[in-house]
Design a protein with these regions (language model features):
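C-terminal tail/sorting-segment detector
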Residues: 632, 706-736
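Glycine-centered coil/turn sites that cap beta-strands in beta-rich domains
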Residues: 632-649, 653-675, 683-687, 695-698, ...
Length: 736
């Protein structure tokens, strides 16, 4: 080893000339043994005010400022080991030991700021020399390298980011949207075709899909497993972008996030800003997928078994995971991912442990998210590089109450037959959602690898046969559903999943498996569904009507045999926008009305960028009879009160005429009738009218009930709402 020597004269050594006793420091803030807390938040004092709502939201939560930690546990030095000493003190001395610790601040590898570029808020611990990685586990590993507290981090850089995240988290936990999305796990697998090139590397490409299938085996029947495997999607080569992309896979991912999913798990290649070489998700100068992720506050927990996607300790670059968790009121509730590279085997082993810990046989864990992750950490480096971005005290979105005594009658169903789900409820009364799903089928996909065709086989989820809602009382429920003519005749049985809630806080979920389907008698029905269009306010719409862009269009589809939702080729539920050329399959958006097996709706989001809307809807009933309907609407962008298409009909009239008009918003309407000379002869009493088309009748009589003489008259219609007023003057004629 090389050695370094220093030489100096003894006279160069300085000696203190005076020592003055200043007294002893009383450590009374954090070294108070009477402290009690379940949850600790660690961050700078500047973040304290922003953290107060979370402190109040959580039970027994203490905010420990970094300044106090450094002062009491590392002699004032900004040393991450001071954080560990503090946390160890809480475990050994506090009256109540905290279980979780939330690190409120970003970090990088340079806590001593040797580079001069460090912007650390709350430091992490860097492990290793040649191969290094960041881990927060070591901050709570007091007797070795296994963490003894559940740890999570929000990589905040500013007080505003803290406020935004805490607002999102509290809103999510206190106003979590109900629905079947809480029973959904979305498994995403990278394409097996690239970037591996050598024949011996083929197993790596295959492993993404194979290990996702392995993970699916850890997930119970009462959960809905959506599979988004990139091998299913077509390749696109565009000269404007380098390499092969799969834009349909990206759009399918966005659609799934919009519909809602409790967990989204990715297995495949990645880097700090990208999933898959085909750019399934990416942040770059040319493309920012983060801005396209819309969850409608059905915030998923993201689990990414890939390389470096959560590399938060890089001084020069922010990772996708950091930006995603910071997204205000959208994006993610929490993220579990790696900050360095990981092997195929270590990856699937850790992911399996996560799901095995959440789903324990016939029960769902009651642990918070941080404790779930802590409980599967063993001190190995593969586990240490998996980080939790988010509050470790956050509860899982899956309802904890399971209903296991449900049954379907009859247990073998024929096509076009009606089945009934019968179950007892832990909730006295409320509403629920039922989904009837065909059995999965084995499929084989081909892909090109090293100029050779390869194949991969997996189980494809069965199509949805029914998706409806119901209400119940007296702690029992018995919703019905119909079997369509289109079934896959899979060798695997069908299943029913359901969720119920009381409209407040109580929820329960369950499923019934082993439902067998067979071919039934043919139907005499030859009529297709009836398709109508409505505004959100319930107004029936027809061609040429007005719809404000701040309202959704309701598409109602009805048929005595029910609506075909299987998605079988040629029998899809399509919405075609003839102005944009876009066609979407609306099967996932269709939901039956409460307690109905005949009628349901699709909520169509209207773009505020368009002036007109032209849609063609095609639908099939369960007996495979088709219908097509078309509508053209004028889209109103302004929120200003206006009256359009005002006329009276018939005109001239003898006994009665109708004043018709369209309103751009609800308003109070009055109509006055005048002679040509301006004398008022009739006032029609003010009445409230709804947005859209309206009509008011008049019998041609004056205020005293007398018939008015033949001739020309003027009418004045006034619309008023709040401080907005509008008038219209027109002519009418009476002729008898």
């Amino acid at each position: 080893k090389s050695q370094r020597f220093y030489t100096f004269k003894t006279t160069d050594i300085l000696s203190p000339s005076l020592l003055v006793y200043k007294g002893e420091k009383e450590w009374t803030i954090l070294r108070d043994k009477s402290k009690k807390a379940n949850h600790i938040i660690i961050g700078p004092q500047t973040f304290f005010s922003a953290a107060i709502p979370l402190i109040n939201h959580r039970e027994k939560t203490l905010y420990a400022s970094l300044d106090k930690i450094y002062e009491e546990f590392s002699a004032g030095n900004k040393d991450p080991i001071g954080i560990r000493h503090f946390l160890q003190w809480t475990q050994e001395n506090w009256e109540q030991k905290p279980m979780t610790v939330f690190l409120l601040g970003d970090a990088d590898f340079d806590y001593r700021n040797i580079t001069g570029k460090s912007k650390i808020v709350v430091p992490t611990i860097e492990v290793g020399t040649n191969y290094t990685y960041a881990t927060d586990d070591r901050l709570s590993a007091f007797n070795g390298i296994i963490p003894e507290m559940a740890t999570g981090r929000f990589p905040a850089r500013t007080e505003q980011e803290v406020s935004d995240f805490i607002e999102k988290l509290i809103s999510f936990e206190t106003n979590m949207p109900t629905g079947i999305w809480k029973q959904r796990v979305t498994l995403v697998a990278d394409d097996p075709a690239r970037p591996e090139r050598e024949p011996y590397e083929l197993f790596i490409g295959r492993s993404h899909t194979k290990n996702s299938e392995r993970l699916a085996m850890s997930i119970p029947d009462y959960m809905d497993i959506e599979k988004l495997y990139m091998v299913d999607f077509p390749e696109k080569k565009d000269a404007s972008t380098f390499g092969v992309t799969k834009p349909e896979a990206t759009q399918a991912l966005f659609n799934q996030l919009s519909q809602g999913t409790a967990f989204i798990n990715y297995i495949g290649h990645g880097n700090p800003t990208q999933w898959a070489q085909e750019k399934l998700l990416i942040i770059s100068d040319e493309r920012n997928d983060l801005s396209l992720i819309k969850t409608n506050m059905k915030l998923p927990i993201w689990i990414a078994g890939t390389c470096n996607w959560g590399q938060f300790d890089n001084i020069d670059r922010e990772s996708f995971a950091e930006k995603l968790i910071r997204t205000p009121m959208d994006g993610a509730s929490a993220i579990i991912t790696t900050n360095r590279g990981i092997t195929v085997s270590s990856n699937i082993q850790f992911l399996e442990k996560i799901f095995n810990e959440i789903f324990r046989g016939d029960s769902i864990t009651t642990k918070n998210l941080g404790t779930v992750i802590q409980s599967i950490k063993t001190g190995g480096s593969d586990g240490e590089i998996f980080h939790l971005f988010g509050d470790p005290a956050m509860r899982l979105p899956i309802p904890k109450s399971l209903i296991s005594d449900g049954k379907v009658s009859p247990d073998t169903l024929e096509t076009l037959e009606v089945g009934t789900l019968i179950a007892k409820s832990p909730i006295e009364s409320g509403s629920g959602i039922i989904v009837f799903e065909d059995g999965p089928s084995e499929v084989t996909r081909s892909f090109n690898y090293a100029s050779k065709e390869e194949k991969i086989t997996y189980l494809q989820k069965g199509p949805t046969l029914f998706n409806g809602s119901f209400t119940f009382t007296n702690s029992t429920f018995s919703p019905q559903f119909r079997v369509p003519k289109d079934i896959t005749y899979s060798k695997n049985p069908a299943k029913v999943r359901f969720t119920i809630n009381d409209g407040l806080n109580d929820e329960a979920i369950g499923s019934v498996s082993e439902i067998y389907l067979s071919l039934g008698s043919p139907s005499n029905d030859v009529e297709g569904p009836i398709i109508t269009f409505e505004s959100e306010s319930g107004l029936l719409l027809k061609d040429g009507d007005i719809l404000p862009t701040n309202q959704n269009l309701i598409i109602r589809v009805s048929d005595p045999m029910g609506i075909n939702l299987t998605g079988e080729k040629g029998h899809e539920l399509f919405i075609n926008n003839s102005l944009t050329g876009e066609t979407i399959n609306a099967i996932e958006q269709f939901v039956y009305d409460d307690n109905s097996i005949n009628t349901g709706t699709i909520i169509f989001n209207v773009s505020s960028n368009l002036d007109n809307l032209s849609l063609i809807i095609s639908a099939w009933d369960n007996a495979n009879n088709p219908t097509e309907a078309e509508i053209q609407l004028v889209l109103l962008k302004s929120n200003k009160l206006d009256m359009l298409r005002i006329l009276n009909f018939p005109n001239p009239f003898s006994d009665e005429t109708q004043f018709t008009f369209e309103l751009t918003k609800d308003a109070k309407i009055s109509i006055n009738i005048y002679t040509i000379s301006g004398r008022k002869v009739k006032s029609i009493i003010e009445r409230n009218q709804k947005l859209g088309f309206n009509r008011i009748s008049w019998n041609g009589r004056d205020e005293y009930g007398n018939l008015l003489a033949n001739g020309v008259y003027l009418y004045k219609i006034k619309a008023e709402i709040n401080n907005q007023k509008i008038n219209h003057i027109g002519r009418l004629a009476i002729y008898r």
